[in-house]
Structures are given as C-alpha cells and as structure tokens.
Amino acid sequence: MATLKDVAKLANCDISTVSRALNNSAPVHPETRARIMEAVKTLGYKPNMVARGLKMGRRNLIAFVSPTIRLNIFSDLSVEIQREAEKQGYQTLIINSKADAVNEAKCLNELRSIADGIIIASTGRNNRLLREIEGDGTAVVQLIRKQDENISSVISNYYDTSKEAMHFLYKKGCRHIGILHGNENVKPFADRLKGYRKVAKELHLPEIISGNDALGVPGFMDGVNGTKHLLELDPALDAILAETDLQGLGALRALKELGIPCPEQIKIISLTGFSLGPMLETAMTSMAMPSPEMGRAALRLLLDRIEAKDRRPPLQHIVFNASLTERETT
C-alpha cells in the first residue's frame, strides 16, 4: 500500500508539501500540485481518512442507531447509509438500541464523544438528551421516526400511506378492513392509525384494530397473533393492513394455519414495503417506502451539519411518499 512518503518521492517534493496539497491547508504551486496528484493516481494512494479527520477536528465516524437490525426496513437503510457514507470517507457504526429507552440513552452517551454525527430512529424517550448532544456539536438527524420537531428528520408520509391503502382495498370490495397496529407513542404507527381511522369514518367502515404496546418494530409473531385477534374481533374480516412486512408475513402464516385463502377471502397490504416483500412465496402487496432515497437524504442532511463548521444549518424535515405495488396478496 502506497504511503505519503512514496507520493512525495515520486512527485519530487517533501512530505509536508504533499500533505498541504491533499488537505488544501496551504497554497501549493500549481505545477507541484499537478505532480503530486499524478503521483497519487499512479500509486493508487488512499489518504487515511480517520487521521485526516482528527487533524480537522473530526473523526470521520457516524452512527446509525436503529430500534432493531432484524429483517425490516432498518436493514435496508443501514446498508444504504453505510454504502453512501463510505463514498464520502466516513466509517459507520450500526447500533441496535433494541427499542429500549435506557439502552438507547447509554448508546447515545457513548457515541457523543466518538461520533461526528448520529442518524437515529428513536424511542422518543430521549429527546432532551438528543438535543443536548446536538447542542454540544454532534450532528443529529432523525430517520423514519420524527419524535422531536426540533431535530431535523427524514420520514415518509405515513398518514397518507394508510389512507391510500384503505381506499385501494375499498375499491377491491373490502368492507371489513383490520389493522395490525404498533405502539401509538411511535410516530409512524400513530400517523398510520390516524389515516386508517379517517378513511374508516369517511366510508362508514368498522374499526378493527389489534394493537401492540412495545416500542420496537412489530414482528412475525405479532402478525400471527394479531391476525387471530382481528378475526376474533370481526369474523367477517376481509382485509388486513400490516404496519410492517414481518407482521404481514405473520398474517399470511395465521391465515394458512386457519385454512383461510389469501387473497380470495382476506387480502393483505404491508404499509412499509421492506425488500423482503417481493421474495415471499405469496408476494406481498405493499405501500413501499423509498428506503434507498431516504437513507441517502438522511446522510446528506447529517453531513451538511457535520461539515458546516461554525454555522448551524437550518432545521429541515424531509417527507417522502410511499408507492403502492400490487402483488399476490390483494
């Protein structure tokens, strides 16, 4: 692997001149700079971004704090954030808070001294701590879960997403539409339920709701048990909105166990659209969030704040729309 000394030797100049040219820390004669850049290209020299960041008062390290790293949209987001951060010379820590407020606070307090910035899908229980961390100079961006209006965020329009899904199912002839719900203190779940209730009221449909109090991301067994609960609430159930793909997968399993055909008797739509959906034996219809674009947008916001130096960029809240992709479950 080529070193700074190798570049200096090939460019016929001293190491300090190479360092100034690469860091733009002081003027370098154009001809000398050209020789240095040609030497860098010839040798395939890669600067040590961590060391370079430390000299500039940065560590070139960001963190993504997620409530889970199981099969769900957060898996997609972590891959995208890590890929894009690497292109910009940043290393990424992926942290699983386990959707536990105490564990989340512990992680955040450790990260505030080592990371330049934090992207977080939070529990909503540590908003004051996040504001303190940002006030101390560590950039913070909320992703998926906008739990604090005073911190920049990237989210999807969860309210309109559930409304669109409800209208789609209604046009399919469904009149007893249930929802596998998450914790109402978590913004995406709360907004989806509001959209569901809005359309149910407009169309004079019954509300059939199976809730979940956990702060985490509802999973497979939540879908299995929730579907059975929905059928207990209304045996005429003819459609299910699943807030996550794993809930939807659990719903499919429950219907299979009960001998209920999908989509002939009960249709299912996932309101998240994780990449797992199309891979299922019965491919799932979904309101797909554009996770690659959302991950990149969150990273851009974070890097803007990290690299702003003395000025503080204005607060930004970016909202993406989900798109309906019809598959076999409807």
Locate each region found by the language model.
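N-terminal helix-turn-helix DNA-binding module of bacterial transcription factors
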Residues: 1-59
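Bacterial carbohydrate/catabolite-sensing allosteric modules
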Residues: 42, 80-91, 117, 135-142, ...
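Short gly/ser/thr-rich secondary-structure transition/capping motifs
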Residues: 42-48, 100-102, 121-123, 224, ...
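Amphipathic helical "hinge" segments at domain boundaries
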Residues: 45-107, 114
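Phosphate- and divalent-cation-binding pockets in alpha/beta enzyme and binding domains
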Residues: 73-76, 103, 128-129, 195, ...
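Short beta->alpha connector loops
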Residues: 98-101, 121-126, 147, 246
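Non-catalytic positions within long, well-ordered alpha-helices that form the structural scaffold/packing
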Residues: 105, 111-112, 170-173
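Active-site-adjacent beta->alpha loops and helix N-cap segments on the catalytic face
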Residues: 125-135
